[in-house]
Amino acid sequence: MSSRREIRWGIARVYASQNNTLITITDITGAEIISRASGGMVVKADREKPSPYAAMLAANKAATEAFDKGISAIHIKVRAQGGYGSKTPGPGAQPAIRALARAGFIIGRIEDVTPIPHDSIRRPGGRRGRRV
C-alpha cells in the first residue's frame, strides 16, 4: 500500500513587462486566485521592480503561499504586454519560471499567451502623435 498524495493542479500566470513582473497562481479553472505577488511587493526601490532578482523573489513568495494552500502541480502561462506594446516578455520571465520549477512544483506545460493582433493595431496618441 503506497500512500500517494493527491496532486492538486493550479495555473501560474506570469506577466512580465518592461516595468514589473506579476505572478498570479489560480486554481485549475482560473476562477479563484490562490496567491499573487509582484516585483514591486518584494523590493524597496521602484527601479528594481523589473529586475530578474525581484521576479525570482516574487515567484518564491507566490509559490510558498500556493504550497501552503495545497497546490502541488502547475501549468505556467507566460505573457508579455502584447497588442501595440512589446510582444516579447520582459527580463523577469525566465527567472520567475526557473524559481517556480525550483520551488518543487510538478510542471505540466509552459505556454506563451501574449495577445498578438492578426491585423494592424492603432497605437495610442492620435493622428498628430503625442505632444510633449
Swiss-Prot record:
InterPro entries documented for this protein: Ribosomal_uS11, Ribosomal_uS11_archaeal, Ribosomal_uS11_CS, Ribosomal_uS11_sf
Task: Please provide, in alphabetical order, the Gene Ontology terms of the cellular component aspect for this entry.
Answer: ribonucleoprotein complex; ribosome
A GO BP entry:
translation
Pfam families from the entry?
Ribosomal_S11 (PF00411)
PROSITE patterns to which the protein is assigned, alphabetical = RIBOSOMAL_S11
Q: Does the keyword Repressor apply?
A: no
The GO molecular function terms of this record are:
rRNA binding; structural constituent of ribosome
Q: Where is the signal peptide?
A: none
Keywords in UniProt for this one? Ribonucleoprotein, Ribosomal protein, RNA-binding, rRNA-binding
Q: What highest taxon heads this organism's lineage?
A: Archaea
Q: How does it assemble?
A: Part of the 30S ribosomal subunit.
Q: What family classification does the UniProt entry report for this protein?
A: Belongs to the universal ribosomal protein uS11 family.
- HAMAP family recorded: Ribosomal_uS11
PANTHER family, alphabetized:
40S RIBOSOMAL PROTEIN S14/30S RIBOSOMAL PROTEIN S11
What's the stated role of this polypeptide?
A: Located on the platform of the 30S subunit.
**Could you identify this protein by its name?**
Small ribosomal subunit protein uS11
Q: Which organism is it from?
A: Sulfurisphaera tokodaii (strain DSM 16993 / JCM 10545 / NBRC 100140 / 7) (Sulfolobus tokodaii)
Write the lineage as a comma-separated list: Archaea, Thermoproteota, Thermoprotei, Sulfolobales, Sulfolobaceae
